[in-house]
């Protein structure tokens, strides 16, 4: 039986979360760490499983790192989580004492504790391009963005009117969706540093062109070394 299926059943969590628990060292057998979700193994009673994830998904670890790096205090802040998905960002925001988090995505799969949290307002089956119709101007203290299969450049202007003056925009920069097909290898892992730097500069320029001021950017925690090197970028609305 696959290891991720065993972990999923024993913890009562999704298969994706089970895989992340395995990859982050949460499973061992008689002292040996098992870190391959696809490992075919018998359900051994000596299999030690610990849910190592502090948040609903690994996105929460990325968000926590960014908040700490930029010294962002979100206590009593009103936030919008764009690309909420499994709830990692949202989970981190509410645990850091946000007043309210509007969570938006095409397919939200939150754990029960987020679904029942009164601070969380869910906008499921909702396209990011509709944010201007959904929310009033100057509503949010912070907008966080974690999207895939789309460039950030065309979306940034949508967020500007929704953020209060001196409010923040925190983007997760994913090079595989920003460098263009020419620089995207079949593996999907972008290693061309010049292409990555150029794409990063383009995203920053797009934000500055609509009135944001860049505060800085930082790498996300290197949880999986074989994946694309993501960065978080912080902007302030002037």
Language model features: what each stretch is:
Residues 86-97:
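Conserved SAM-binding loop of SAM-dependent methyltransferases across substrates and taxa
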Residues 104-152:
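S-adenosyl-L-methionine
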Residues 166-179:
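Conserved beta-strand signature within the Rossmann-like core of class I S-adenosyl-L-methionine
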Residues 222-238:
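Core SAM-dependent methyltransferase catalytic element
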Residues 75-85:
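Conserved class I S-adenosyl-L-methionine
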Residues 58-75:
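Conserved alpha-helix/loop element of class I SAM-dependent methyltransferases that forms part
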Residues 1-43:
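A basic, amphipathic helix-loop patch mediating RNA/tRNA/ribosome contacts
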Residues 153-168:
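A short glycine-rich, Lys/Arg-flanked "PGG" loop and its adjoining helix->strand segment in the class I
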